[in-house]
Amino acid sequence: MKKIVCYIREKSNLLVAIPINMLLATVGLIPFLAAAQSSPAYTIQGAVRTTTDAPVVGATIVLEGTQFGTTSDVTGTFTLDLKQKPSQGSALSVSCIGYKTKRIPLTESNAAISVVLEEDNNLLDEVVVIGYGSVQKKDLTGSLSSIDGGAILNRQTQTVSMALQGAMPGVTVTRTNSAPGQSATIRIRGITSMTEGASDPYVLIDGVPGNLSDLNLTDVANITVLKDAASASIYGSQAAAGVILVTTKRGGNSGTSVTYNYTLGLDFPTSMPDYMNAVDYMKAVNELNYNDFPGGGWYQTYTKDVVDNYWNLNREDPDKYPNTDWLSLLLKDYAVRQSHNVSFRSGSAKRSTSLNFGYDDVDGLFTKNLSWKRYTLRLNNDFELFKWMKASADISLRKTDKVNPHTSPSAQMRYIPAIYAATLSDGRYAEGKEGSNKYAALMDGGTIDVHGYKMTGKFQLDLTPFKGFSVTGVFAPNFSYTKEKDFQKQVPYFRAGDSSTVSTKYITEATTTELKETRSDTFSHTTQFYANYQKTFGEDHNFSAMIGYENYKYEQEGLLASKSKFPHSLIPYLSAGGTSDVVAKSENVFELARRSYFGRVMYNYRNKYYIQGNIRRDGSSRFAPDSRWGTFLSASAGWVFTSENFMSGTKDWFDFGKLRVSYGELGNERINGYYPYQTTLTPAYSVGYIGNTVTSLPGYSQTAAVVRDLTWETTTTYDVGVDLTFLKNRLSLTADYYYKRTDDMLLTVPIAPIIGLSDPYDNVGTMNTRGWEITLGWRDRIGDL
């Protein structure tokens, strides 16, 4: 008889497919087993099978509201030992990946239980997150994609942003920097605006603004990407480049579990140029010069005697005739990265808790001074205070420690010629190329140490005064603090043949010892109030509406101070610098506020014809009062044509077909600067004469030109798509064609240099983006797989 195997596990693989695994996902069952082994007073036995009578191996059986549970064995049978007889009304929860969870009420007569699990292969019943709510996938009229937390975890990356690479159509993920912990750049359906940062998608974590770098991979339950205006317009001015909605894991009501996950990975440098030794380099340079000027002969730069005898000269005097493999000096063969994650979940019908702790340690590929460490903690709590009142309290903490070299050799190391020495034979640093020595700068030229601290919270109250109507209030504070210490150390070099131990010559990357200290703290908070109403009239008319208000406030303060002329490089503090005053100092303070009103209406007739409308009115402090507010609309419609009578003959192989169309407008106000419409003054000094004495007096000056009537950049999006499933929902196809047009782009406009002010922003420029997406999938169960 065919046997069905159900694995409840978290999987961990190495980058580059090196098979090193250490996983203790089954620790989650230890509380169940321990509880079951202590003097059982009541035993429940049974079997779990499929609708085809095949045994299900590894199904999880839990007594609801308790920590007691077990799993089915290779024959599909199970035994659950309890300390006492279950109370009246108790029930078992039986679950297995790929099957619908089943609830079995316990009675006096069912000490031996037979459980039949039905396959859960209907993708259309999947619930997906949308703005300020969720819907079944079959009811969507907009374009979106989603990926669950298990798939995210299996992608074996250090950051959530990189885990999205190649995971969804229309979502492009690139990485321009390979430094440890570096986040990726995400583009949803291409570039939306030419303004820096305006093409970044809007990220919300559990409904409030956040950053993907705040998340550990094990925190994620689901990620949904809203791609068209009909889906994203409920978020208004922040959603022009798309929206990424992250749902984190909650406690649930399936008892208590503890999971530990350890991942070890190795990173290798790839696509590096082949090493060219000194002789090959000299020959190549001579050939280059000969091709440019044949009349000068073959040996225009390096003489024939030097080229032919270089290896002998190198053996006799390697300092004067070096052969340096710069890549080998600057790069390791591989770098180690590791992650530790501990998850605790506990829950019942009235309360649940999810606690995730993560630690990431990533070593860089540079020989020295490149590393990244991250500590994350996320605590999610849910409470049912009354049947009509629920609350949640979420707290997240993150600490990052990053070390970078003061001077990164990443660009130059690929083409520094081998004829320049990095070190002399006695270990002293050599001159390099005309005083530039990337190896000396990397090893002893100083570091940039960045320490970041972040705390976020979300406190939510949900009221359901009567069926179908709910009111939600959210307050979400966010605090972050960053301190950076950029300590450049003076590095002396020596020429070949110089036997002195003290040098007055320093590499060009570090001619002085200098320290820059930076401090930055930000505080923001989001307040939301929204109400949802759902009602079915008769049996055919399904209606839902949502209305809400949101307020966002952001404050930032920063401080920079630097000092040079350090007598030594041992103590990286400003007080240890030279006798001169702090040579540079600056301070900045910024504020930003947004206020929004929004609403949505959804209607479908017989789950066949769908319409949806959204409206959002946004106000931003970046614009003058007369231009501050913008209204953004969207509409979409869907038609499930497989529900029509003329499609009745295709039901054996054509399960579902829906046509979608949408139109929407979205705004953008993300530009560099918080007061682009307003003249700002910067502290400055003016120099003049008082009598015959040249005198410097403090004052203020205008540094930037402004445009008073600056207003919203607007992106209009059109989308046509289809959702199709065939062969009992095993084969699925989703296809979309989209067109985006951005008007009144917020760009800097050049002005005459003689004016003496920097260029202002203005609403100029138009950009078009178009494209298509296709997702083809097959979902099936084949034997034990």
Where do the model's predicted regions map?
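Extracellular/periplasmic, surface-exposed regions of secreted and cell-surface proteins
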Residues: 152, 199-200, 380-389, 394-399, ...
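A subset of solvent-exposed loop/turn segments in beta-rich extracellular surface proteins, enriched
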Residues: 418-432, 492-508
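Short proline/glycine-enriched turn/loop segments at secondary-structure junctions
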Residues: 233-236, 408-410, 648-650
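Proline-centered flexible-loop/turn and helix-kink motifs
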Residues: 164, 169, 417-421, 426, ...
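Short, small/polar-rich motifs associated with maturation and membrane association
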Residues: 1-378, 390-392, 456-457
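Extracytoplasmic gating/loop element in the C-terminal half of outer-membrane beta-barrel translocons
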Residues: 296, 316-317, 494-496, 620
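Low-complexity intrinsically disordered tracts that form flexible linkers/tails across taxa
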Residues: 400-414
